[in-house]
């Protein structure tokens, strides 16, 4: 990604129609880069997998909702594990179209919408709500967590993964990793050429504590916070020095991914 600038702290990031419209347009442009990527059983680049962490447990006969369902491959994974109902929400019409094809032979319910929006999904209905590398796109984290809380049955689980909030500040040059910018300043970061395309996007920038505190405010009980180790699937793999944003070289020194599991009381 080609970083343009990080804006100054703007306080609580509220729902922005302009940001959502721009991100939606750009995601429709770059969706083909993500077909089958950032999907279960994976949690993120080089991160431990569901097979290693076992956060979902048994999902047979459970109703599941995928926030930021992308190409539908995480829902496909849930179907293969016996989930009874598959629901998904994604901002991108192109992603939803791909997900329809991925899930063509199983019953599913897909909606093209921002995750921040109230779109009439059933309340106190789902056993599990999850989001794999998507939750950080929300322009209103508090509203999104409150909606997710409302979708879950009492005792239901909410599991999400996202870039470790400090990882974006770790740059690599000639094998040396250094801190770039201020982790303290929340706000938004703009990228002009997402995935090398003419696809400008705006991504909120938040601290790890912000995610945790907003979960608490939404009445979730936090069960687990994971700063993921490198998956055992990369055991023995060589780590060539790389200046790429995601690299095994960096991942073995700092977690690319945070994973949080919380419960509705």
What are these regions (language model features)?
Residues 142-157:
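A short glycine-rich, Lys/Arg-flanked "PGG" loop and its adjoining helix->strand segment in the class I
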Residues 133-136:
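Short catalytic micro-motifs in class I SAM-dependent methyltransferases
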Residues 201-225:
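Short alpha-helix
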Residues 162, 166-168, 196-210:
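Acceptor-substrate binding/catalytic loop of class I
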Residues 120-129:
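A short acidic, Gly/Pro-enriched loop at the edge of an enzyme's catalytic core
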Residues 65-118:
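Class I SAM-dependent methyltransferase SAM/SAH-binding core
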Residues 4-60, 73-77, 158-190, 236:
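Conserved class I S-adenosyl-L-methionine
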């Amino acid at each position: 990604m080609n970083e343009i600038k990080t804006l100054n702290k703007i306080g609580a990031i509220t729902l922005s129609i302009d940001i959502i419209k721009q991100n939606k347009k750009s995601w429709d442009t770059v969706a083909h880069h993500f077909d089958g990527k950032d999907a279960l059983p994976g949690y993120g680049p080089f991160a431990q997998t569901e097979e290693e962490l076992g956060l979902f447990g048994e999902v047979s006969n459970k109703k599941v909702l995928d926030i930021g369902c992308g190409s539908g491959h995480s829902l496909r994974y849930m179907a293969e594990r016996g989930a009874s109902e598959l629901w998904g929400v994604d901002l991108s019409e192109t992603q939803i179209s791909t997900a329809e094809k991925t899930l063509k032979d199983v019953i599913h319910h897909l909606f093209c919408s921002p995750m921040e929006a109230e779109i009439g999904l059933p309340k106190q209905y789902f056993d599990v709500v999850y989001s794999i590398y998507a939750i950080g796109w929300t322009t209103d984290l508090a509203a999104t967590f409150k909606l997710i809380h409302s979708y879950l049955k009492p005792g239901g689980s909410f599991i999400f993964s996202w870039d470790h909030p400090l990882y974006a500040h770790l740059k690599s040059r000639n094998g040396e990793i250094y801190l770039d910018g201020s982790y303290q300043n929340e706000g938004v970061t703009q990228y002009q050429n997402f995935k090398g395309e003419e696809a400008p996007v705006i991504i909120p920038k938040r601290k790890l504590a912000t995610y945790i505190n907003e979960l608490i405010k939404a009445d979730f009980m936090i069960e687990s916070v994971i700063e993921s180790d490198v998956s055992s699937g990369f055991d023995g793999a060589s780590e060539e020095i790389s200046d790429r944003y995601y690299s095994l070289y960096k991942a073995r020194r700092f977690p690319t991914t945070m994973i949080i599991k919380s419960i509705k009381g």
